[in-house]
Amino acid sequence: QPESSAASDVYKRQVRFFEGETDNNELFSKKLAQLADVFVMDAFGSAHRSHCSTEGVSHFIDSCVGRLVEEELNSLEGILNNPSKPMLGIIGGSKISTKINILESLLEKVDWLFVGGGIANTLHKSKGYEIGQSIVENDFLEEAKDLSKNNKIILPETFVVEQKDKSIVEKTFEGILPDDIIYDVSINSIKSLNNIISSCKTILWNGPLGFFEREEFSKGTLHLAKVISESDAYSVIGGGETLTAFNQSNLLDKVGYASTAGGAFLEYIEKGSLPSLDALKAVSYTHLTLPTTL
């Protein structure tokens, strides 16, 4: 513990360097609690982690959430428990294995669920479509097949494809060859959502629709960001690449709420709770004011 008799602020280096932090070690949690009188949990992006500095410390000190966490919770609670309908969910990313639970959870809440990225490839393959050499999770084809039976799910029908000779073309299902690699949804696929987006009152989006790191395969994601920013729907977005798409297009101020979190954003949507928040609920709050969402 640093000597700080005359100081009001104590700054610790990245706590993950300390032994016991990621194991939620009780002794280290107690040591952290000895540094202050009140613990303010304001790291929503880490609220899904049961670590000493996010969960453990709250058992040994008066604790509360900060303003950022309060904003995040109020925003997410609104669209999860009392959203204006109709509601569109959009999920992208490469692996269905990391998002299958959130897909199932969202299907209970939304009117439509548009799926892109590698997740869509696995869903497409489960339905018997050719996807060439595109990223896919073959171990999850059965789960994907069950999901794809839900008529709320919308899959892209045209794609931006890199062919064997490295040329980049737009193709429909019928044109996909065994050596092709699907890297993005086409702008035409986004345009097919125009009527749905224009009728929506609420839109929730997490994850890129293509290989966003390469400029030539970021156009689907960027175009969807533009369309959503121009809609009248209340939009909530989360995840680093999704925020980057809006920020890159100078559209971040056009969304209803931009979450600072990725994993915590998804876990809260799926479960309605997070480990660090559950810990806060379990402790006593002397002289502290909490948001109504807790």
Question: Where do the model's predicted regions map?
Answer:
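Active-site loop-to-helix "anion-binding N-cap" substructures in soluble metabolic enzymes
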Residues: 5-284
